[in-house]
C-alpha cells in the first residue's frame, strides 16, 4: 500500500511539474519522513495534554528539571521531538495510540482527547458543587447519582488529506519548525486553561478531606465514532444558569494555526469550560447554603401580592439546580401574577391577601399596606384621611393623575352584580361644587360600616376637563354582592380587621364626619335605593357648609372673568355686563339648598376694584340714565333700569354704584349682607331666561338649566309712577348729569343704611316676606 501511495504521489507531482525530473526514491523518502512527522505530531500532542492534566507541574517541563535529560536518572524515556522534552507517561497505554501509528495518513482518523472530572469516589453524604464568578455554589451532582463524569475540555487533532499544498520543495525543515512553534503554543496554553488550575488546586489540597475524592481523567477517542453522553454531564450542558453567567456562553473554543503539507493539513482545536472551580460539600452544608440564599433573595410577599423589582422570571437559586428536592423548596413564581408597587400612585386597588387559613402574617401585610396608603395621602385633606381610615385596604389615587382604574369583575357574580362591577371601571369622583352629574353606580362604593360614602374633594373651580378623580371606598353593602368577593377575586382583600372596624365605627358615630352622594344621585337620575346611606340630605348640607370658602373664591374669579369680557363693550352696555355678573353669581346661589348659608360676596369688591372703576369711567362717558336703587313699601329692594323692557335681578347692587363709596364702611357692610341673601323668584311667570356670557368656573354652575343659561328675574315691585318718572326724566348736559348722579347716590346710601338696620332677617324670613308682599300686591 505504501508503494501504491508513493506512485500516486509521483504521478501527481509529474502532472503539476512536468518539466521536473524527480526520482522515485526521492519522492518515497520525502513522503515517508513526512508521514513519520505527522504521526509524531499526534503522539506529542497526546503527551503534552495528558501530562498537563495528570503529572505534577515540577516534573512536567524538562527545562525546569535538568535531571530529566539523563536517561539513567529516570526509569522513563524522554521524548525529545520538536525540541520539547517530555517524559513518556506510563499511564498512557500504547494500544490507545495504535490507530495513529499504524495507519497511513489518508486512513488516519481524527483524534479526540477528553479531560473529565471523575465523581465515582464521592460518598453518600457528599455533593459536588461549582462556584461561579461571584462565589455562589451551584449543585452539579450527588453521590450515587446517574452522572459519574463531568467533561471539562475536548481536544480535536485531525489530518485533512483533502487540503494539500501540492509543493515538492524540500518542506520537511519548514514543517518541523512550524511544529515546534505549534507544540510550544499548546504546551503554554494547556497550562493557562481552567482545567489545569483545577488540577493544580487538587494537588495542593490533596490532603484535604473535601478534595481528595476528586480526580481528573483523560480519554483518547476515535473521532469517527459517535460520542455518547450517557452517565456523564457533557460539554454542551451548562451547570451555572445562563442568566448568571458573566460571558456569552459557559464554554469557549480555540483554533491553533494549522500546518500545511504536500500530503494534507494538520489541524488542532479545543473546546473547554470557562468555570472549573469544583468543590465537595456535605449535604447539610448545601441545605444551609440554600436556605441562606433564600433569605437573602427577595421573595414574593403573599400579604399584599407584590414582588421586588430585581426578581427574575424563573427561579434561580444556588445549590438547587441539580436537585429536584431542593428545587421544590426554592422560591418560584406564584400561581397568581403579582402586581408591583407603583412609584406614582394611580389609585390602584391592592391585590387580595391569602385566605384566612393561610395568613399567619396577614397582620404584617395589612399594616404595611396601611402605611403605604397613609404615606401616599399625607399631603391630602382631612376628608381623604377619613376615606383612608374607613377603607385601609384600598389605596386612593394621587392628585397628579386622571387615569382610569379598571377593576375586573368576579366570575361568580350574578347579572346584577356583574353590571355593578362593570361600572367600577370608571373613575370615581365627587365634584367640589353643588353636585356632579356623573352617572356612576355608587352601590359598589358604599361602606357597610358607615351610613355614607367618603369622597375626596377636588378644587371648587377649574375647567371640567381638568377635574381630578379619586377612588372612593370599594365595599359591598348587600349580602348578595358580598358573596361575590371570593378568594380569587381582586376585591376579596378589601376587608377591615376587627380592631379597625371598631375604630371606624367610633368615627362614623360622629355626624360631622358623614358625607353622602345622595344629592348627586338625585340630580343624575339614579334611584335612591342604590345608595348605601339613608341620611343623604343632611349630609349634603354639611358638605355644602364646608365648601363655602371654596365657593367664595370661585365666585370672585367668575366675576372677574365676566367683567373682563364685558369691558370691551360700549359704555351703555357696561353696566348691564356688570349686572350679568351679579346674575351669574346669584344663579349660583340659587343652586344651594335653603338650609345651607350662601357664601358672602363681600370679597368680590376687594378682588377687582380696578375693574369696577374702569367700568364706571366708561359708563359715565356714554349716553343713558344710571340705574336707581329704591326701597318699596314692602321692605324689598328693587333695581330700576333705564328701560322697562330690560329685566334686572332683585336686590342687585351694581359695582358701578358702589365704586364711589368704598370709604363708607357702613355701606360696605350693608351691601355684603344684601348680597349674601338668596334671591328667589316669586312666580314662574316673571322669570325670563337670558344667555350667559363669559367663562364658567365650575361645572355645577348650569346644572339647573340644561341650555347653559342663567335666569333673570323681573322686578315685580316696580311702581308705575316710578317708571313714568324715569321715562319722562329730561335729558341734561354732561356736567349737570354728573352733579345729579352724585346727589342721587348720596340719598341712596342713606336709604340703604336705614333699611339695612331695619331689615336684617334670615333667609326663610325674606322668602316669607316676599311671598306675602306678592300676595298683597296681586290682590
Swiss-Prot record:
Region of interest: Disordered: 298-368, 392-488, 520-541, 571-652
Pfam families reported in the protein's UniProt record: ATG13
Main location: cytoplasm
Top-level taxon in the UniProt lineage: Eukaryota
Entry keyword annotation includes Transport: yes
Keywords annotated in UniProt: Autophagy, Cytoplasm, Protein transport, Transport
Biased composition (Polar residues): 308-320, 426-455, 471-488, 520-533, 642-652
GO cellular component: Atg1/ULK1 kinase complex; cytosol; phagophore assembly site
Location within or outside the cell: Cytoplasm; Preautophagosomal structure
Annotated GO biological process: mitophagy; piecemeal microautophagy of the nucleus; protein localization to phagophore assembly site; protein transport
Segments of skewed composition (Low complexity): 394-425, 456-470, 593-602, 620-632
Protein family according to the UniProt entry: Belongs to the ATG13 family. Fungi subfamily.
Role, per record: Activates the ATG1 kinase in a nutritional condition dependent manner through the TOR pathway, leading to autophagy. Also involved in cytoplasm to vacuole transport (Cvt) and more specifically in Cvt vesicle formation. Seems to play a role in the switching machinery regulating the conversion between the Cvt pathway and autophagy. Finally, ATG13 is also required for glycogen storage during stationary phase.
Subunit field text: Interacts with ATG1 to form the ATG1-ATG13 kinase complex.
Name of the molecule in the record: Autophagy-related protein 13
